[in-house]
A protein has these predicted regions:
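Extracellular/periplasmic carbohydrate-active domains that bind, remodel
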Residues: 1-460
Length: 460
């Protein structure tokens, strides 16, 4: 592999001089020669405008090296500035999936990669402002995406650390054969929308051994409207990750005009998070064949500005607005999942789209009050007809579903609050199948299981 050291292209690495020209020159020469490695050497801080990564080029950030994003918004690549949508062109749009400003950008760059044990400092606090002690507002724009790679195959991201993202951190869109291996993302837990890893209409993705802390979803599979030309989000493996989020640790949706299928999530630990595992479909896409196994989840409530009410597992499908329709969700399984938090499992379909074939086996769900924030709520946002709804909290809260199987699973209660209630609260469920279920009500003289228009099959 041919090496291109940015110092030989005039980079200073003093943390003050803008080294973008030197880094880009090295990338361009590397690409012209057929590919190789562009090295940011150890011991230097490279302050830089945006970089455009190219085909078969590995941007290698050595251990002890940092590339720091400029605070000057005019120094960022604007891949969608010509889009006939002023909002998208200026600030980006999470539903369309099209970013406004990007720090490291690639398009049609097969074989590109970022590697090394160095650091990408995204300089996020140059683009946000604090709203209160719990929340850094998303109302200050533009906020750049850190890495956006579109229509590029056989790409990889290995070993490096990202800190202080102002917006989404790693967003591959329309890519096939994506490896994300042992990267660290350490974002401010108060900065809204600082997603960790967002594969969007991507296929054959492996996310392995990563540690992510962020103030939005740590890992979020998307099928956004703006990238719908690229097909479904499918064949995804997430394994061996440790995750902390003020939103959902691992989510499918809500951006889902396309389909999601064949997803395996295993051997992950989720701690200090608002939600654990979440499937939220709002734009007509469908989800099928998703398996979660060997996962530990710890949830708690955060400030009400954050969506979610500490549900360890969420499966919902609703219309986002008047112009969208909910999609279908089926064949979802949970094996050996241990969850402890302030709320229970939420499964909520609707009359038009019943959630089908959901299985829990060898799982443990414990509700225990740990924060100062209100209980007795379920958060169904974003959707047309519901918001944050008031209900007693149950270990399993199920609405509009079919063939829900709960096997060899137990529910428990820790520190109680007044809203803690049933082991299972189910309505409009066809075939709720319980086998060796061990669950009691949180309250004396209250049924363990509450059902309404439910066909229940119970084998102790």
């Amino acid at each position: 592999m041919k090496i291109y050291n940015v110092m030989q292209y005039g980079a200073k690495g003093d943390g003050k001089t803008n080294d973008a020209f030197s880094i880009q020159h090295a990338v361009d020469d590397c690409a012209k020669s057929g590919g190789g490695r562009v090295v940011l050497p150890s011991g230097y801080v490279f302050y830089s405008d945006s970089i455009r990564l190219k085909k078969n080029v590995d941007l290698h950030i050595q251990k002890g090296a940092t590339i720091k994003a400029t605070s000057n918004i005019d120094g960022y690549i604007r891949p969608n500035k010509l889009i006939n949508d002023p909002k998208t062109a200026l600030i980006g749009n999470p539903v369309t999936g099209k970013p406004s400003f990007v720090f490291i950008y690639a398009y049609e760059a097969d074989g590109c990669s970022i590697s090394g044990e160095g650091t990408i400092d995204a300089n996020g606090h140059a683009f946000v402002a604090r709203k209160d002690q719990y929340y850094v507002t998303g109302d200050f724009y533009p906020r750049p995406t850190v890495m956006y790679v579109e229509k590029s195959n056989h790409i990889s991201f290995r070993d490096f650390t990202v800190v202080d993202a102002p917006f989404w951190t790693l967003h591959p869109a329309g890519c096939d054969d994506v490896l994300i291996d042992k990267i660290r993302i350490l974002n401010d837990l108060d900065v809204a929308n600082s997603d960790g890893i967002d594969p969007d209409h991507c296929s054959n993705v492996r996310i392995l051994g990563c540690h992510v802390t962020c103030a939005d979803d740590c890992i979020c599979l998307k099928a956004s409207k703006g990238n719908s030309e690229y097909g479904p989000c499918e064949n995804i493996i997430i394994d061996g990750c440790t995750l902390v989020s003020t939103s959902a640790a691992i989510k499918i949706g809500t951006e889902g005009v396309g389909d999601f299928k064949n997803v395996i999530v295993s051997n992950c630990i989720i701690s200090r998070s608002n939600r654990g595992l979440s499937i939220q479909i709002r734009d007509g896409g469908c989800v099928e064949n998703v398996s979660y196994s060997n996962i530990i989840i710890e949830t708690r409530r955060f400030c009400p500005d954050w969506w979610g009410t500490a549900e360890p597992i969420v499966i919902t499908t609703f219309n986002r607005d008047e112009n969208t329709k909910s999609g279908t969700i089926k064949n979802i399984s949970f094996f050996n999942v241990t969850a402890k938090g302030e709320n229970g499992v939420l499964i909520h379909g609707n009359e038009d789209n019943i959630i089908e074939d959901v299985t829990f086996e060898n799982c443990s769900i414990e509700l225990t009050k740990t924060s100062k924030w209100q209980c007795g709520l379920y958060d169904l946002r974003p959707c047309l007809d519901y918001g944050v709804e008031s209900y007693d909290n149950s270990a399993f809260f199920i609405r509009y579903a079919k063939d829900v199987n709960i096997r060899k699973t137990k529910t428990r209660w820790g520190n109680l609050c007044d809203s803690y209630s049933y082991a299972i609260d189910a309505a409009n469920v066809e075939n709720l199948n319980l086998y060796e279920f061990d669950g009691k009500s949180a309250k004396e003289n209250t049924d363990d299981i509450k059902i309404d228009r439910v066909k229940l099959n119970y084998k102790k």
